[in-house]
Amino acid sequence: MCSGKSTVGKLLADKLGYTFWDIDQLIEEREGKSIEEIFKDKGEEYFRSLEMKVLEEFLEKEKVVVSTGGGLGANPTAMEKMKSAGLVVWLDLDFDTFLRRCAHQEGRPLLKRGLDYLRALMEEREKVYRLAHIRLKADRPPDALVEGLLSQL
């Protein structure tokens, strides 16, 4: 959440000449609702199942950059599938930077659950994120993150 996955993903895809896909955006388009509305109307479990279905569509594709939501990247099954299909990058964001970036964003249902919940959620997700092939500190501008990533490819 709020690490810059979509922005960095688009920039990276442009640099590589690949196609960019944002799983959250695809889900919203297909459902005709925002993620917040999906959570409210059908629940988090339904949304997480949609994430996995959409991810499965990209596992066999080549020359794509895929941005996942933070919850999908924290799913151990999804992480293993992504790692076997391609390179997985973790944009690591410290909690204070996360709060600054997310403070004014609408449509993020998990942000409404309070600071203690968010801190615990980030700590729990990091256990799976650490399995990514590459870890980049996400406290720099998006173009600097892309250059840093390209230097590691």
Place the predicted regions along the sequence by residue.
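Walker A (P-loop) phosphate-binding loop of P-loop NTPases
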Residues: C2
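Walker A/P-loop
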Residues: S6
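NTP-dependent small-molecule kinase module
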Residues: L11, K15, K61, E124-L153
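ATP-dependent small-molecule kinase phosphotransfer cores
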Residues: I23-G71, N75-K83, V128
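Short glycine-rich anion-binding loops that position phosphate/pyrophosphate groups of nucleotides
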Residues: G70-L72, D94-D96, P141
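A glycine- and Lys/Arg-enriched "phosphate-lid" helix/loop adjacent to the NTP-binding pocket
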Residues: A85-K127
